[in-house]
Amino acid sequence: MTDHRTRFLQLALDADALRFGEFTLKSGRLSPYFFNAGRFDSGAKTAQLAQCYADAIEAAGLDFDLLFGPAYKGIPLATALACAYAGRGRDLPLAFNRKEAKDHGEGGTLIGAPLAGRQVLIVDDVITAGTAIREALAIIRAAGGTPSGIAVALDRQEIASDQDRRSAAQAVAAEAGIPVIAVANLGDLLAFAAGNADLVGFQEPLLAYRGRYGTDTTG
């Protein structure tokens, strides 16, 4: 496992953003783990998270020249990532959307740098159903930008349903024709748990969950 994956998972565990136990997801599935990016709730935690994103993005070799954060969780993530890149000597423009359009002031649903003519990297926490990402793709294209990739913190690598054996991330990538990369995925989480004495007891539930709901790429 590459260093940014290990650092991210340990950071998430320390921040209580990554928890193990029994959790009922929105899908109704009973999961042995739960990830909540909202627990990266301080400047130091968010800055460290952004460095993990930057390392994962650079390792993937994505080509982009603007960062876009979908409302709501994508906004602080993209902002922190822009700061991380600035610290590495690359000053990237940044934009995000509102959930509700304003009819006063600058108006509209977009805030930040113009998207026209830009290669846009979308930054979010996870892709669950893919609704927010699909909305972001439409917004970017309508504003004259070109989506070039999507970066998320954690890919659960779960099938959408027994009828559709793809994950939400795989479905979005296929529809949009762009790469979706994650700082870490379920396979990384399994390796991380196996190497952590405090988490060894969760190996069996994690493996069982992957066997039931995992895509063909989780091995």
UniProtKB/Swiss-Prot annotation:
Binding site for orotate: 34-35, 128, 156
Known EC number: 2.4.2.10
BP GO annotations: 'de novo' pyrimidine nucleobase biosynthetic process; 'de novo' UMP biosynthetic process; pyrimidine ribonucleoside biosynthetic process
Molecular-function GO term, any one: magnesium ion binding
Pathway the protein takes part in: Pyrimidine metabolism; UMP biosynthesis via de novo pathway; UMP from orotate: step 1/2
Residues that, per the record, bind 5-phospho-alpha-D-ribose 1-diphosphate: 26, 72-73, 98-99, 102, 104, 124-132
Subunit structure: Homodimer.
Stated family: Belongs to the purine/pyrimidine phosphoribosyltransferase family. PyrE subfamily.
Name this protein carries in UniProt: Orotate phosphoribosyltransferase
Organism field: Xanthomonas axonopodis pv. citri (strain 306)
Gene: pyrE
